[in-house]
């Protein structure tokens, strides 16, 4: 059955269960690719209170790719510093990562309801994307070529090719799939209180590793501050939610707790869990439905956005006929290992922060202070080098031999600012577009690949980019109408290629390096990639590249970048 025929036999291509940030991001990715998408959400509207409070550089890069980063940025606090204090309020450690190698700051406070609202508003660009509010998925039956979804209160089933459960930790999709959710739930409880008209007012965040009562104080944006306090074992949930108790907790950090304006408060526990499979047949899990982690690294929200970025382009390629269904198996292969690493890191940091035994806390403090006098260890913490970065050894990547720790294939490519002949000081992804890209240093991709392979990538909607020193930008000796020439404005591209032997990169739509090689090996690596990416010979049925309803919304070339998106 051809993809076009399958599209005629279904009501939509992809059903997404859940209109949270992961489902909304995935719907925007699919919408940009011309994929018919339906979100079903049992709530009547978006959740209007904050849950996540931190965005990282990878999430902002994804929002850039879907053309919404300019809408999101006003609701963020970029380059947010996080400080850790001991029980005597002496500084233990500080996280202030200075670089923006992926185009955006590594740490950003944000107001989740406002960002989610922008993600939802972005769907209005796509007539082929629909959100059904107030509809709960009752059941989902898989058939040979799709899924049939039944919604409560609607007698007409929805037929789709694939279903993605983005429906949270209590995922109905996961239960219907019969997938386990292994892990642990911490016995420790926390009181979270969100405050309007920030009573402290400073722009950064802190964690108090006080054995008497660990706490967190987080600046979000728009005058909102979040406080979190550990609840002792002898304190009940009812006590913790009593206004007098809340005022007593706030009084530890605020001079007049009775004057604060509480947005909401609740008691919660930390979960460290991961689904037994992210894919089963034509059904997938993403976000909290696939994994839950403690809040200490602020990676729950960001890990879900990574899921959407990884799965979205693969679904679009398969639905459009540009790739075979086997490409979708790489979603689980690639995302599971990294999600597990994030869970383990977040769990470990929580254990470091929250011991209530004073002797254990004292030993911890001495170890951290001892490490801080070693420059390499201090930079390791300051620059957040401990954060696990995706490095795919298997999946939709090609390694000609066993990957080494320095192999670029399977890693996320940098995003410096560059000049083209049409624009100056733009982020690299604005030139690369939102599909596949072939990027080489100081060479012509057509000459390296040969006509047949070049045309095959072109049929898949790939962009071809030749990076040069800025001094060579306007030299026209090797001009090619299908190749965009960029000038290395900051020297970051030359620095990257100088540090690696590879000079030709094949970039996936999520900007992961699918394959890399020296110039002479470009044809053989290209051919191998068509295999591991399960790409089709014909190039699909025309919904990629310039035929998409919206490719991207370019960011302003004059945007100040020193504090937000890298130094020009």
UniProtKB/Swiss-Prot annotation:
Enzyme Commission code: 1.14.13.127
Upper taxonomic lineage: Bacteria, Bacillati, Actinomycetota, Actinomycetes, Mycobacteriales
PANTHER family: 3-(3-HYDROXY-PHENYL)PROPIONATE/3-HYDROXYCINNAMIC ACID HYDROXYLASE, FAD-BINDING MONOOXYGENASE
Cofactors demanded by this protein: FAD
Function: Catalyzes the insertion of one atom of molecular oxygen into position 2 of the phenyl ring of 3-(3-hydroxyphenyl)propionate (3-HPP) and hydroxycinnamic acid (3HCI).
GO BP terms: 3-(3-hydroxy)phenylpropionate catabolic process; 3-phenylpropionate catabolic process
NCBIfam families on file: PRK06183.1-2, PRK06183.1-3, PRK06183.1-5
Family: Belongs to the PheA/TfdB FAD monooxygenase family.
Gene Ontology MF, one: 3-(3-hydroxyphenyl)propionate hydroxylase activity
UniProt catalytic activity: 3-(3-hydroxyphenyl)propanoate + NADH + O2 + H(+) = 3-(2,3-dihydroxyphenyl)propanoate + NAD(+) + H2O; (2E)-3-(3-hydroxyphenyl)prop-2-enoate + NADH + O2 + H(+) = (2E)-3-(2,3-dihydroxyphenyl)prop-2-enoate + NAD(+) + H2O
Name under which the protein is recorded: 3-(3-hydroxy-phenyl)propionate/3-hydroxycinnamic acid hydroxylase
InterPro entries, sorted: 3-HPP/3HCI_hydroxylase, FAD-bd, FAD/NAD-bd_sf, PheA/TfdB_FAD_monoxygenase
Name of the gene: mhpA
Enzyme class: oxidoreductase
Keywords linked to the UniProt accession: Aromatic hydrocarbons catabolism, FAD, Flavoprotein, NAD, Oxidoreductase
Binding site for FAD: 13-42, 278-288
Pathway membership, UniProt: Aromatic compound metabolism; 3-phenylpropanoate degradation
Classification via Gene3D superfamilies: 3.30.70.2450, FAD/NAD(P)-binding domain
């Amino acid at each position: 059955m051809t993809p076009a025929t399958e599209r005629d036999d279904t009501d939509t291509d992809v059903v997404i269960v859940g209109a949270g940030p992961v489902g909304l991001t995935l719907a925007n990715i699919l919408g940009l690719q011309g994929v018919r998408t339906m979100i079903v959400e049992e709530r009547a509207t978006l959740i209007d209170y904050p849950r996540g409070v931190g965005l990282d550089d990878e999430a902002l890069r994804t929002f850039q790719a879907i053309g919404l980063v300019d809408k999101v940025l006003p609701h963020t606090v970029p380059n947010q510093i996080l400080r850790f204090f001991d029980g005597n309020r002496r500084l233990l450690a500080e996280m202030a990562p200075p670089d923006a190698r992926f185009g955006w700051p590594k740490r950003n406070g944000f107001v989740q309801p406002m960002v989610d609202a922008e993600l939802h508003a972005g769907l209005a660009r796509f007539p082929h994307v629909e959100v059904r509010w107030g509809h709960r998925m009752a059941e989902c039956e898989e058939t040979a070529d799709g899924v049939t979804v039944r919604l409560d209160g609607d007698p007409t089933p929805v037929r789709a090719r694939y279903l993605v459960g983005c429906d949270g930790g209590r995922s109905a999709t996961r239960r219907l799939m019969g997938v386990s959710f292994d892990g642990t739930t911490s016995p420790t409880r926390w009181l979270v209180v969100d405050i309007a008209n920030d009573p402290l007012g400073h722009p950064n965040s802190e964690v108090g590793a006080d054995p008497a009562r660990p706490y967190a104080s987080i600046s979000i944006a728009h005058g909102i501050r979040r406080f979190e306090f550990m609840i002792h074992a002898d304190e009940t949930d009812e006590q913790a939610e009593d206004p007098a108790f809340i005022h007593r907790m706030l009084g530890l950090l605020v001079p007049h707790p009775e004057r604060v304006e509480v947005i909401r408060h609740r008691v919660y526990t930390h979960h460290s869990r991961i689904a037994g499979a992210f894919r089963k047949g034509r059904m997938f899990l993403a976000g909290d439905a696939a994994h839950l982690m403690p809040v200490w690294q602020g990676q729950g929200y960001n890990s879900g956005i990574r899921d959407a970025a990884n799965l979205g382009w693969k679904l679009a390629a398969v639905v459009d006929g540009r790739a075979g269904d086997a490409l979708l198996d790489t979603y689980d292969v690639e995302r599971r290992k990294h999600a597990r690493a994030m869970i383990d890191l977040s769990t470990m940091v929580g254990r470091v922060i929250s011991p209530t035994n004073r002797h254990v806390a004292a030993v911890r403090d001495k170890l951290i202070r001892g490490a801080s006098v070693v420059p390499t260890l201090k930079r390791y913490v300051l620059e957040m080098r401990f954060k696990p970065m995706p490095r795919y050894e298997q999946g939709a990547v090609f390694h000609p031999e066993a990957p080494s720790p320095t192999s670029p294939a399977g890693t996320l490519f940098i995003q410096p600012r560059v000049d083209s002949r049409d624009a100056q000081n733009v982020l690299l992804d604005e030139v690369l577009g939102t599909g596949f890209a072939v990027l080489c240093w100081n060479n012509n991709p057509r000459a390296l690949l040969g006509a047949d392979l070049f045309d095959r990538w072109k049929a898949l909607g790939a962009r071809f980019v030749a990076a040069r020193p800025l001094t060579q930008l306007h030299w026209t000796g090797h001009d090619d109408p299908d190749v965009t020439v960029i000038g290395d404005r900051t020297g970051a591209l030359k620095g990257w290629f100088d540090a690696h032997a590879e000079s030709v990169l094949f970039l996936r739509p999520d900007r992961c390096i699918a394959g890399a090689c020296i110039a002479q090996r470009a044809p053989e690596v290209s051919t191998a990639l068509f295999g591991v990416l399960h790409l089709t010979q014909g190039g699909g049925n025309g919904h990629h590249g310039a035929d998409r309803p919206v490719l991207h919304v370019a960011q302003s070339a004059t945007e100040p970048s020193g504090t937000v998106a890298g130094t020009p």
